[in-house]
Amino acid sequence: MSTPHINSKKDDFSDIVLMPGDPVRAKYIAEKYLSNFVQVNNTRLMLAYTGFYKNRKISIMSHGIGIPSASLYTRELIIEFNVKKIIRIGTCGAVRDDIKLRDIVISMGASTDSKVNRIRFNDHDFAAIADFDMIYNIVSISKKMKIKVSIGNFFTTDSFYNDDKKMLNILKKYNIIGVDMETAGIYGVASELKVQALSICTVSDHITNKEFLSSKERESSFNDMIELALESVL
């Protein structure tokens, strides 16, 4: 069933969807890792593909930037296309000195400055957390694949450009492992609609020391994260 944002048939999607923010990355993942894949959405250039990874049917769809966009697409995928498991595979910023560029970080929970989860939760704070089984599984697989991961709390913000040094110090104080713009919203939708969700990110920017990956470096720095996510859903 089509929605205003996803022009697809009911059975076009797998029950498992991996979601990068960038539609170009969705295309890259499909072309590099999936066999017999087809494009199942291009509305608003939010590209989606369904194919097979080691005989497992999997869909890849971009969710755009920010909680409103990510919440909209995850909600429609769950309600209209019967998606049961979502993995965000994105990028994040780091504030801790021990977290470096290209490190893979897994969000077990996410605080936020967004109002979205409070709107959902009758103006109260909502504990936006990942699915425990998905965390346990992906950590186990990371050890088998010898891929180093770090696990902790994220901070999901509506403001990409924010030079508030006081807030930066608070993030450090509370041991925030990654800063992004989507995770808390995705976890909120998943909890409300009773599906599984996990956010796994590669550090593309270090907020404290101002280091960042170039556009070219980003093209080749995310494969470990992508392969880990794919292996975790087999």
UniProtKB/Swiss-Prot annotation:
EC number: 2.4.2.1
Catalytic activity: a purine D-ribonucleoside + phosphate = a purine nucleobase + alpha-D-ribose 1-phosphate; a purine 2'-deoxy-D-ribonucleoside + phosphate = a purine nucleobase + 2-deoxy-alpha-D-ribose 1-phosphate
InterPro entries: DeoD-type, Nucleoside_phosphorylase_CS, Nucleoside_phosphorylase_d, Nucleoside_phosphorylase_sf
Annotated residues for binding of a purine D-ribonucleoside: 5, 180-182, 204-205
GO biological process: purine nucleoside catabolic process
GO molecular function: purine-nucleoside phosphorylase activity
UniProt keyword list: Glycosyltransferase, Transferase
One Gene Ontology cellular component: cytosol
SUBUNIT field: Homohexamer; trimer of homodimers.
Primary role: Catalyzes the reversible phosphorolytic breakdown of the N-glycosidic bond in the beta-(deoxy)ribonucleoside molecules, with the formation of the corresponding free purine bases and pentose-1-phosphate.
Name assigned to this protein: Purine nucleoside phosphorylase DeoD-type
Protein source organism: Buchnera aphidicola subsp. Acyrthosiphon pisum (strain 5A)
Name of the coding gene: deoD
